[in-house]
């Protein structure tokens, strides 16, 4: 509210917080008879909000849950986290339903991999020939490929002291205004 934002990029799991913020804005505006605080709306870049599942086979991915991959994690760390992801004993019958931990891995695969890769591993699962080690290795590679531009941009920003000073100065001026 303090920034009087009209659009806020939040995930599906944070929408209830945004609704609470809208209620606060409405209440303040009604009590004081002004339109001071806009009611912020969820912003999602034209896509439905996606809940990224955790690597431990349950719930969402999150730092507090200890089951997340940071966008700036080092290569070795990402590989280690993915290889430790929870799996099951594998499908016993063709076209069997996936367990929750496996669905989670396939959801992440769908987010970072090519459709051909997803189709390949889906077919492997359906015909009971999937090797989870191969799936995890491919998933780690695809996560690394997906996060590389983010890491490069982060490194550019973090190493540009002049830019960082400018951002801090502008931010401080806007906060005081």
Regions flagged by a language model, labelled:
Residues 16, 22-177:
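Conserved nucleotide- and phosphate/pyrophosphate-binding catalytic cores
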Residues 1-14, 158:
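Conserved alpha/beta enzyme-core scaffolds, especially Rossmann-like or related mixed alpha/beta domains
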